A protein has these predicted regions:
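Terminal accessory/targeting
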Residues: 1-79, 90-236
Length: 236
């Protein structure tokens, strides 16, 4: 996140770990704009929709500025996605695709959860309904990316598991993955003081996700299913 409070530290760590696959998490909700005049960004999805409708936000200029900031820090992103999946909105998607093409970033996230993300149950009815509704946008989404020469994965998983990501759910998901390339969205981390004070609901769950990703059961499930772990750089 180019407008994130810990950007400088994250960029330093990325430079120290050149094998790390780093993407750009484009932000149009929350925080301050990177592009002049560095105004406050909308605080919610409804506020962003109103800003888009009123043409009060220069989407392309802001997203391009965020990518330029990352490039200036010595990092070339391998992929793009957006905070809160805002590129599901047509004007944002167009801007993201333009930015990807301009800066030679080949991959863009396709955030349409595969139904089996809810393997074993547990996803809220709202998340299941939202995920199902979003899939109706998939055709147009893929056409826009193709028109700009962008690539995306065959499948995506993780939306319905957000906040309830545990070893059991991950093992079930791995065993039910379809053929092709699947991006797994996750939010692993350590619950330190900064995270406790952060404005996010994903706090304790980050340690649960980290535990699931490192679990022996997860490794065994990957082996049993014949799943190969890759990153975007390996797919370029």
């Amino acid at each position: 996140m180019a407008n994130g409070e810990a950007f400088d530290d994250a960029a330093r760590l990325a430079r120290q770990t050149p094998s790390l696959d780093v993407g750009c998490h484009l932000v149009l909700i929350g925080g301050w704009a990177v592009a002049p005049p560095h105004a406050r960004l909308p605080e919610s999805a409804p506020a962003l929709v109103r800003a888009l409708a009123g043409r009060r936000i220069a989407v392309y200029e802001e997203l391009a500025a965020q990518v330029r900031k990352i490039l200036a820090a010595g990092i070339h992103p391998t992929h793009l996605d957006t905070h809160k999946h805002t590129h599901l909105a047509p004007p944002v998607l167009e801007a993201v695709a333009r930015v990807a093409a301009e800066f030679d970033i080949r991959w863009v996230r396709k955030p349409f959860d595969i139904p089996l993300t809810a393997a074993g149950g547990g996803a809220t009815a709202l998340k299941r309904a939202t995920s199902g509704s979003l899939r109706l946008l998939r055709g147009r989404f893929e056409r826009v990316l193709a028109r700009h020469g962008c690539r995306t994965t065959d499948h995506f998983a993780g939306f319905q598991m957000t906040g309830r990501f545990r070893t059991r759910e991950l093992v079930r998901l791995i065993g039910a993955l379809p053929d092709g390339i699947t991006e797994l969205m996750c939010h692993p981390g350590y619950l330190g003081g900064d995270l406790r004070r952060a404005h996010t609901r994903l706090k304790e769950s980050r340690e649960h996700e980290l535990e699931a990703l490192l679990a022996a059961e997860t490794r065994a499930a990957l082996t049993a299913a014949g799943v190969e772990l890759v990153n975007y750089r390996m797919l370029a």
